[in-house]
From Swiss-Prot:
<dbReference type="InterPro" id="IPR005922">
    <property type="entry name" value="Phe_NH3-lyase"/>
</dbReference>
<comment type="function">
    <text>This is a key enzyme of plant metabolism catalyzing the first reaction in the biosynthesis from L-phenylalanine of a wide variety of natural products based on the phenylpropane skeleton.</text>
</comment>
<feature type="binding site">
    <location>
        <position position="375"/>
    </location>
    <ligand>
        <name>(E)-cinnamate</name>
    </ligand>
</feature>
<dbReference type="GO" id="GO:0006559">
    <property type="term" value="P:L-phenylalanine catabolic process"/>
</dbReference>
<comment type="subunit">
    <text>Homotetramer.</text>
</comment>
<dbReference type="GO" id="GO:0005737">
    <property type="term" value="C:cytoplasm"/>
</dbReference>
<dbReference type="InterPro" id="IPR022313">
    <property type="entry name" value="Phe/His_NH3-lyase_AS"/>
</dbReference>
<feature type="modified residue" description="2,3-didehydroalanine (Ser)">
    <location>
        <position position="193"/>
    </location>
</feature>
<feature type="active site" description="Proton donor/acceptor">
    <location>
        <position position="98"/>
    </location>
</feature>
<dbReference type="GO" id="GO:0045548">
    <property type="term" value="F:phenylalanine ammonia-lyase activity"/>
</dbReference>
<keyword id="KW-0587">Phenylpropanoid metabolism</keyword>
<keyword id="KW-0456">Lyase</keyword>
<dbReference type="InterPro" id="IPR001106">
    <property type="entry name" value="Aromatic_Lyase"/>
</dbReference>
<dbReference type="InterPro" id="IPR023144">
    <property type="entry name" value="Phe_NH3-lyase_shielding_dom_sf"/>
</dbReference>
<comment type="pathway">
    <text>Phenylpropanoid metabolism; trans-cinnamate biosynthesis; trans-cinnamate from L-phenylalanine: step 1/1.</text>
</comment>
<dbReference type="InterPro" id="IPR024083">
    <property type="entry name" value="Fumarase/histidase_N"/>
</dbReference>
<feature type="binding site">
    <location>
        <position position="447"/>
    </location>
    <ligand>
        <name>(E)-cinnamate</name>
    </ligand>
</feature>
Length: 707
């Protein structure tokens, strides 16, 4: 601001460094943020004005959904035209301008007055990518990433600091709205002066280069002329006559920003999913819910941890599994671990920092997709071309590296939980490998899935290695530091994909565990009924109808059934090698030893009742166990599935009913991979989002009060 004498006066500014704005953007819960992202993703139109684009909107346009349209703000037209006119006026006056009358980068000392020819050469020499033969060796960027990049580039150019013509932005918008996607090379950018090599192919398409290709709405291959005609751009191709047609299209990192936006949309959803999966893990493992108590996390102060714990606390609050587990913990408490293992007990502390990192990265990318990243920047108000470095993609490379590390940490936790879940030494009574068949010798359940999980986890941990520390000096040492943003974003996209493989496999395993707890409860009930019936028939009265001392054994016999893991004997409940029969006999023997002088009398001896009890039980128990199993399989169980009384039920219901999965056994043809594939596809399509959020619909965004 200048006074009447022409001196610049410093104007008082609020939040001049934007720290307050950055902090304000993190207000509220992460879950609310994800809900807003999902709502934005589902809007039918994206209106671009240069400053309000979101990660979710970019992800939506990337999906090639015909139901969503891109609209340009007419209010931006004047600013874009003003900067374009300024460039033309500057050139007509003979002003020396970078990229208009000069060469590029390290060769900017060269000069020319042939602005159109210079732009044409810029696009030609940057067309240096390799595509491969598209069969065994395809090096084409995913079309979703290209669409995302086009959207981001339009948005940043709309702010009117780049010198480009508005009709170019309209042409790119029409390509998007007609589902016509330029073919870009997968590799070849260091995200220094933007993603120059890949983006040159977009410029090549709209200017009619013969090597330019696009993919049409039905997957057909189009040349430049066909692409522009189908997009109804109103012309065949754009002739390269403007001195600022090529450079503004290229000088920015929209490619990496588009991919980063897609990646972070999914990463945020996966972060919430990991919280809910950890809570379900606590349910099926009969975990102690006190690990979510708010005081513990309040004393640590980290918002991500506090929210993760509060979400898990909400799922576990009132859970039928937690209520049942409380009774188990009260039984023989001195013979059981006092606390759960780290993968369960410290899951909020583990997930909290990852959520904070992913959320911070999301905000950083949203600032970037609404930034002006060109060089030079055209300041029409001051009649200046400012030569700077906003094209440097360091915020993107760093945020992608950080996000990838967070994703790897989430995957590590899921693998640790999965490993406990399938191991009968740790899983509190579930069968080894989560086998559900009648014969464990012919059913190995999730053994293959565990091997696959180890593979996924190893790859994910490798992908966590940073990219940004591998910078090489480029372009004759002009681009001697560069962000490697797109490489990092590509690796983060791979990490998201691998984490989805892990999450889908883990969710199928959790549903298997839920059904096994359901089966376990019904089998135990059948065993208790059988023991009760046999005890009453064989232990209540003596040979002459008199009451027998053995009648007092029934309570201890039922206590044995409660204490023994059902799946430790369910395949052959009367086997002498399994613990049930051994401990039932021991309970009778203990009573006999306390029977004193009565044992000398055949009419009152408990020892003499043991054989009759065991023989009768062997005749009854296998039939009762099989009948209970059949009742569960046919949908007529004596005891309903507890999951229906839990807040985690919507996710289970979606996997079982929505996707048509089932309890896996060695007796059936269906394999674990088939079920995991269904869940993975649902994750990729986004259909898992609604049941996930349904689990948390009643959460008020705060922990339970400390009482």
């Amino acid at each position: 601001m200048a006074n009447q004498n022409g001196f610049c006066i410093k104007k008082q500014q609020v939040d001049p460094l934007n720290w307050e704005m950055a902090a304000e953007s993190l207000r509220g819960s992460h879950l609310d943020e994800v809900k807003r992202m999902v709502a934005e993703f589902r809007k039918p139109a994206v209106k671009l004005g240069g400053e309000t684009l979101t990660v979710a909107q970019v992800a939506r346009i990337a999906s090639r959904d015909n139901a969503v349209a891109v609209e340009l703000s007419e209010e931006a037209r004047a600013g874009v035209k003003a900067s374009s006119d300024w460039v033309m006026d500057s050139m007509n006056k003979g002003t020396d301008s970078y990229g208009v009358t000069t060469g590029f980068g390290a060769t900017s000392h060269r000069r020319t007055k042939q602005g159109g020819a210079l732009q044409k050469e810029l696009i030609r020499f940057l067309n240096a990518g390799i595509f491969g033969n598209a069969t065994e060796s395809c090096h084409t960027l995913p079309h979703s990433a290209t669409r995302a990049a086009m959207l981001v580039r339009i948005n940043t150019l709309l702010q009117g600091y780049s010198g480009i013509r508005f009709e170019i932005l309209e042409a790119i918008t029409k390509l998007l709205n007609h589902n016509i996607t330029p073919c870009l090379p997968l590799r070849g950018t260091i995200t220094a002066s933007g993603d120059l090599v890949p983006l040159s192919y977009i410029a090549g398409l709209i200017t009619g280069r013969p090597n330019s290709k696009a993919v049409g709405p039905n997957g057909e291959t189009l040349n430049a002329e066909e692409a522009l005609r189908l997009s109804r751009s109103g012309r065949r191709i754009f002739r390269v006559a403007s001195p600022r047609k090529g450079l503004p299209s290229l000088m920015a990192p929209p490619l990496v920003l588009g991919m980063a936006s897609m990646v972070l949309f999914e990463a945020n959803v996966l972060a919430v999913l990991s919280e809910v999966l950890s809570a379900i893990f606590a349910e099926v493992m009969n975990g102690k819910p006190e690990f979510t108590d708010h005081l513990t996390h309040k004393l640590k102060h980290h918002p991500g941890q506090i929210e993760a714990a509060a979400i898990m606390e909400h799922i576990l609050d009132g859970s039928s599994y937690v209520k049942a587990a409380q009774k188990l913990h009260e039984m023989d408490p001195l013979q059981k671990p006092k606390q759960d293992r780290y993968a369960l007990r410290t899951s909020p502390q583990w997930l909290g920092p990852q959520i904070e990192v992913i959320r911070a990265a999301t905000k950083m990318i949203e600032r970037e997709i609404n930034s002006v990243n060109d060089n030079p920047l055209i300041d029409v108000a001051r009649s200046k071309a400012l030569h700077g470095g906003n094209f440097q993609g360091t915020p993107i490379g760093v945020s992608m590296d950080n996000s990838r590390l967070a994703l790897a940490s989430i995957g590590k936790l899921l693998f640790a939980q999965f490993s406990e879940l399938v191991n009968d030494y740790y899983n509190n009574g579930l069968p080894s490998n989560l086998t559900a068949g009648r014969n464990p010798s012919l059913d190995y359940g999730f053994k293959g899935a565990e091997i696959a999980m180890a593979s996924y986890c190893s790859e994910l941990q490798f992908l966590a290695n940073p990219v940004t520390n591998h910078v090489q000096s480029a372009e004759q040492h002009n681009q001697d530091v560069n962000s490697l943003g797109l490489i990092s974003a590509r690796k983060t996209a791979e990490a998201v994909d691998v984490l989805k493989l892990m999450s889908s496999t883990y969710l199928v395993a959790l549903c298997q565990a839920i059904d096994l707890r359901f089966l376990e409860e019904n089998l135990r009930n059948a065993v208790k009924n059988a023991v009760t019936q046999v005890a009453k028939r064989t232990l209540t009265v003596g040979a002459n109808g008199e009451l027998h001392p053995a009648r007092f054994c029934e309570k201890d016999l039922l206590r044995v059934v409660d204490r023994e893991y059902v799946f430790a004997y369910a395949d052959d409940p009367c086997s002498a090698n399994y613990p049930l029969m051994q401990k039932l006999r021991q309970a009778l023997v203990d009573h006999a030893l306390q029977n004193g002088e009565n044992e000398k009398n055949t009419g009152t001896s408990i020892f003499l009742k043991v054989a009759a009890f065991e023989d009768e039980l062997k005749a009854v128990l296998p039939k009762e166990v099989e009948a209970a199993r059949i009742a569960v399989e046919s949908g007529n169980p004596a005891i309903p599935n507890r999951i229906k009384e839990c807040r985690s039920y919507p996710l289970y219901k979606f996997v079982r009913e929505g996707l048509g999965t089932e309890l896996l056994t060695g007796e059936k043809v269906r394999s674990p991979g088939e079920e995991c594939d269904k869940v993975f596809t649902a994750m990729c399509e986004g259909s898992i989002i609604d049941p996930l959020l349904e689990c948390l619909k009643s959460w008020d965004g705060a922990p339970l009060p400390i009482c």
